[in-house]
Amino acid sequence: AAGVYSDHECSDMDDAMAKLRNGQFIMIRDGTAAHNLEALVDLLRQPYYDRCMFCTDDKHPSDLLEKGHIDYLIRKAIHYGIDPIVAVKTACHNPARYFALNNRGAIAPGYLADFAIIDNFDDFNVEMVFRKGVLTCSNGAVHDFEAPRIEDYLVERAHDTFHVAHLTAEDFHDARPRGVIGLVPG
């Protein structure tokens, strides 16, 4: 079946509830330009939170450095009184389920065992990172790790993909009129 399965543009509960009733997932957006978490925080309670996930949509690099990324939304949701487990599930499990990443988003048999250990739910500082169950980062230091192997067919698809005739400076000449914006009396 074709259709729109999610929305990241909701800015109020009425809009979000209408989309939930139509079967959509709600991506609760809180980035640099749009801040919708506070208005939509009640979605992170039963019976709705299983159909919600966090997204940033846009995030200025300085905001990433100062505030964080999805971890910032988790901390902010907890600040608004959301159960920390629900906040983490909204950041990890729900998006993995939505995007059909069936071996990610949880710590369980058959999953990849990609996870982070944090100090506490207030500060959310990462103390350790595990990838496929192997410690890859601790105490702020990245451990040696084997570079992932990229399948040959993916390498082939990424190379020799842009084919264009030889270009000259004349090819970039633009003869369209300039300064076309003006005032119309009236």
Give a label for each model feature.
Residues A1:
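Glycine/alanine-rich phosphate-binding loops at beta-alpha junctions
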Residues V4-R104, A116-F124:
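Active-site-adjacent C-terminal substructures of enzyme catalytic domains
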Residues L65-G81, I85-G186:
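Active-site microenvironment of metallo-dependent hydrolases
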